[in-house]
């Protein structure tokens, strides 16, 4: 195994976590890495920290750019990446030591286009030897088989950082310029291009669950990008009867989540009718008896209440 892996790290306001993140990549047991740190106009000490790391390790390259968001930061790095394989790490997370060795080994042994693993999620840092020791399994399957889960928005299939992509498969593929959920459409199109994938149950990545991160902070205008991300998939599958029902489900899930966030935070309520309209466009698909996807009775009840009595829906959501 001597393939070059390009590891892309967007960096913005992660000063507290950046050293741990980069150190974990530098310390990988697989050494043939191109580490691209993209300083997305971070206003703290991150730019200087990135430069300091580049001086310590010749495998590290730093891109300094104006702040345009994580999607553009990743796209900028993708356009310059030289690796045979591509990986992504978020600046506030870190990798366990064998991550890229094992992802690449699985990719080569199974002869697949995308290799993915499980991950450990917490707000408390752990070391690899503290993880539960379970027998490692690697399952090879057609990428087409997991497209329903991608369309629905299954988290493990939607994120970037637990995967290794063959560069030739994702060549020219970019993320839409969204503030959140931009990785879901990227993965959707990557899986559409891929032939075979490998899925390991081994926890190789530490995902830091912190309340101030982009994905977990309080409801804000960028949260509506979750709907835009699903809309991209919905439009792509509108003429595909096999996947369109799953794309609808993912779109409805996103709209209901955004609507609940709006109501709970009492923010952007001027857009309530807009999001409600998004949902009601697909009430027939959810409420009819014979559907490709069987929705839970609880979800059907939410749809009916939102349709017939939006004021009651708001009161129930606020309880």
Model-derived regions, located:
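Catalytic core of nucleotide-sugar-dependent glycosyltransferases
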Residues: 204-210, 216-242, 257-286
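Glycine-rich, basic loop-to-helix element that forms the pyrophosphate-binding segment
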Residues: 65-81
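Acidic helix N-cap motif at the loop->helix transition within catalytic regions
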Residues: 19, 33, 44-52, 94, ...
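Membrane-interface aromatic/basic loop that binds lipid-linked glycans or pyrophosphate carriers
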Residues: 264-319
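N-proximal low-complexity "stem/linker" segments adjacent to membrane-targeting elements
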Residues: 1-26
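Donor-binding/catalytic cores of nucleotide-activated saccharide
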Residues: 91-197, 208-221
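A conserved acidic beta->alpha catalytic loop
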Residues: 24, 31, 39-48, 66, ...
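Short aromatic/hydrophobic "clamp" motif used to bind/position activated sugar donors
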Residues: 86
């Amino acid at each position: 195994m001597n393939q070059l892996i390009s590891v892309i790290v967007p960096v913005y306001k992660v000063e507290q976590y950046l050293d741990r993140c980069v150190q974990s990549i530098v310390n990988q047991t697989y050494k043939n890495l191109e580490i691209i740190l993209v300083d997305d106009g971070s206003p703290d000490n991150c730019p200087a920290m990135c430069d300091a790391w580049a001086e310590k390790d010749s495998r590290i390259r730093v891109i300094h750019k104006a702040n345009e968001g994580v999607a553009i930061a990743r796209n900028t790095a993708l356009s310059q990446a030289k690796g045979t394989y591509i990986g992504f790490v978020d600046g506030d997370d870190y990798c366990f030591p064998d991550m890229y060795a094992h992802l690449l080994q699985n990719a080569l042994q199974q002869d697949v286009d995308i290799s993915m693993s499980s991950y450990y999620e917490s707000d408390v840092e752990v070391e690899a030897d503290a993880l539960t020791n379970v027998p490692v399994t690697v399952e090879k399957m057609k990428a087409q088989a997991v497209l329903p889960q991608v369309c629905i928005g299954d988290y493990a299939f939607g994120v970037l950082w637990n995967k290794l992509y063959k560069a030739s498969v994702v060549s020219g593929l970019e993320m839409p310029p969204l503030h959140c959920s931009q990785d879901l459409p990227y993965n959707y199109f990557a899986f559409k291009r891929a032939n075979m994938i490998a899925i390991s149950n081994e926890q190789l990545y530490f995902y830091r669950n912190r309340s101030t991160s982009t994905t977990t902070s309080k409801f804000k205008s960028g949260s509506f990008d979750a709907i835009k991300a699903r809309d991209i998939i919905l439009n792509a599958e509108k003429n595909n009867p096999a996947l369109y029902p799953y794309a609808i489900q993912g779109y409805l899930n996103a709209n209901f989540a955004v609507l609940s966030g709006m109501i709970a935070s009492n923010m952007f309520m001027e857009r309530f009718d807009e999001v409600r309209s998004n949902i009601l466009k697909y009430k027939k698909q959810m409420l009819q008896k014979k559907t490709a996807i069987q929705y839970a009775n609880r979800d059907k009840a939410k749809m009916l209440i939102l349709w017939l009595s939006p004021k009651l829906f708001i009161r129930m959501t606020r309880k």
